[in-house]
Amino acid sequence: MIDTVKLRLNYTESPTFNVGQYLDNSKSNMNTDTGELWGSGTLRNMHVFYNGGGIVVEGSIGGFLFPNNSRIPKRQDVGTAIEQLSDLLHLPMSNALVVRLDCGYHWNMERPANHYFPLLCEATYFERLNQTSTTLKYAKGGKKETNVLIFYDKAKECKDKGKPLLDGFGENVLRYECRWMSRVSRQFGLGQLTASILTNEDFYHSMVKRWGDFYESINKSFRGDYDMPLMGNVRLANDFIYSILLNLQDAGVVIDIEKTMKDSNVFGEKGWQYDNLRRSIINRRAKVEQYASYGLTDELNDKVRDVVNNCE
């Protein structure tokens, strides 16, 4: 589940420590007055930056450990990666502060990945930023992006990088990631989140639960059949019609209704009306969605919930 990490280790007691000697593609400089070294390089797939105050290591755990990055690292694999980094760099990387953390999973799906993007609508606390033929992204925190949720076509990514998928994966592979981009320790309610904590069972389970909770916070649309006998409490024809029409729209189209009206200054100084509009759209869509067969949405919901419920 844990994929990309960014680790920072301070070692102010040794400003002349030459990390570059252990790196590939090493580029270094030295302060001739103090002997302080700084530079960069790579270690397998990891990018390494260092100076007299410390070292920053960033990259994919899966890419570091395995020749094929479609293999999903387990909790124990993270511990192995930290141990290997410590040995290769001759530094106690288990003490490093985690300043970025990505958690993700990918699945074989019934349909191509981009068929699921239109079913994922607005999300609590997140802005739905962009949807392309291969990627859907949500972000929180404005320009600083403290958190990012991303759904993308894993099969195409592997193909573009010239790395075949593992046996068992077909052409329709969808990946969902949650990325904690900043203030990671604070977001998890910890004074300091160090690399050694990443393999702690309680922490790991809480991380996977947050990954699942963020997914659940996304409102879903659908294409489906309706169980008409159960719809007796939908009293108004307009409620049914509006809900069906809204659910037939792509998620981005629904969200753009509010933006279009804001750009046109429809409500003038009555800015609170836009919040009412958004709530009205969500409520009308929800009127009949509980009676629908979700199809692709059900499939994705089940995939995510299965990972959360069976986390090891």
Can you say where each PLM-predicted feature lies in the sequence?
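Structured, helix-rich domain cores that form ligand/interaction pockets
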Residues: 1-257, 304-312
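Short, solvent-exposed alpha-helical "recognition" segments
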Residues: 283-299
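Helix-turn-helix DNA-binding segment
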Residues: 266, 275-286
